[in-house]
């Protein structure tokens, strides 16, 4: 094995030719050319939790500093879906599965028009994906969308801290970031009502106009796959902004109302709760995730923050 090649290439038994040219590596194995683009422009960076715990890794994507809630996700697959899920808006996500990016990217499985995570924290970032549908490197996707990512870090150690102490604030910063400014970051209040940052801005329709059922979707941060599933079940959809009025929903005359998933604290959605109350007895209502909690509050229930957040 050519000594300039490592990581994924160590899987191969022998090399016919190995060379390095500029910022690209090329390896000829058994008549096939495998290429990768070096993770150029990377630098050391830190995740600092509010309890003072520090984890060192390497930065890729955007190099801007991040202050956010740090949560973990234990999924073995679906890293692209997590990154683009509006439910993670305003949060930095720690992926516990050790290898991320191994099947590349595929636009058809994204859950929103763009990434919503404020930061992404992974163990090993694969730059040699294996997937016949792959459309590009995950590292390039992070760069393209300006998402700060910390890799080469022990994500399971981070998760143990969060498991023992609960979800907490954290900052992602470059190694050259001024120490005095880190304290200023921790003093910042995290944004509230993330729903209004991710909801659609206008009413719209999608699906087969001749479908048997018509469903009004209250978009608190709805995932694309939920919309696709409703369409596949024979529904045409009218998607409303999170702050839509009940009279506008009823004017569309849907067969039922769907309250979607979304990010943040449901107690910030008093405006949505009041409108849902006005739908009682008029249309069937179904809620999922955030929508479920909005519906519970409309019926007089209360909600509280869980220790671990998303898992």
Show where each model-derived region lies.
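Cysteine-nucleophile active-site neighborhood
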Residues: 256, 261-311
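Targeting/processing segments of secretory and organellar proteins
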Residues: 1-4, 22
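RNA-binding accessory domains that recognize and position tRNA/RNA substrates
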Residues: 42-214, 218-243, 247, 252, ...
């Amino acid at each position: 094995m050519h000594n300039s090649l490592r990581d994924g290439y160590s899987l191969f038994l022998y090399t016919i030719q190995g060379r390095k040219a500029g910022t690209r590596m090329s390896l000829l194995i058994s008549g096939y050319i495998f290429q990768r683009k070096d993770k150029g422009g990377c630098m050391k960076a830190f995740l600092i939790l509010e309890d003072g715990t520090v984890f060192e890794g390497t930065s890729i994507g955007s190099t801007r500093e991040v202050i956010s809630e740090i949560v973990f996700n234990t999924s073995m697959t679906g890293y692209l879906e997590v990154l683009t899920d509006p439910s993670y808006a305003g949060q930095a996500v720690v992926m516990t599965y050790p290898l991320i990016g191994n099947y590349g990217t595929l636009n058809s499985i994204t859950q929103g028009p763009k990434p919503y995570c404020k930061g992404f924290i992974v163990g090993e970032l694969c730059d040699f994906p294996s997937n016949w549908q792959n459309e590009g490197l995950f590292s390039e996707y992070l760069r393209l969308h300006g998402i700060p990512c910390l890799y080469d870090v022990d994500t399971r150690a981070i998760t143990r801290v969060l498991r023992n102490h609960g979800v907490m604030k954290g900052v992602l910063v470059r190694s050259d970031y001024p120490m005095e400014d880190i304290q200023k970051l921790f003093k910042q209040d995290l944004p509230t009502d993330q729903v209004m940052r991710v909801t659609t801005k206008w009413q719209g329709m999608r699906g087969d106009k001749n479908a048997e059922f018509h469903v009004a979707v209250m978009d608190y941060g709805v995932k694309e796959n939920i919309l696709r599933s409703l369409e596949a079940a024979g529904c045409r959809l009218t998607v409303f902004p999170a702050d839509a009025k009940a009279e506008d929903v009823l004017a569309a005359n849907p067969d039922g109302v769907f309250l979607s998933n979304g990010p943040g604290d449901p107690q910030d959605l008093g405006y949505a709760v009041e409108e849902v109350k006005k739908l009682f007895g008029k249309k069937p209502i179904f809620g999922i995730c955030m929508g479920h909690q909005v519906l519970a509050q409309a019926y007089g229930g209360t909600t509280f923050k869980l220790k671990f957040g998303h898992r």
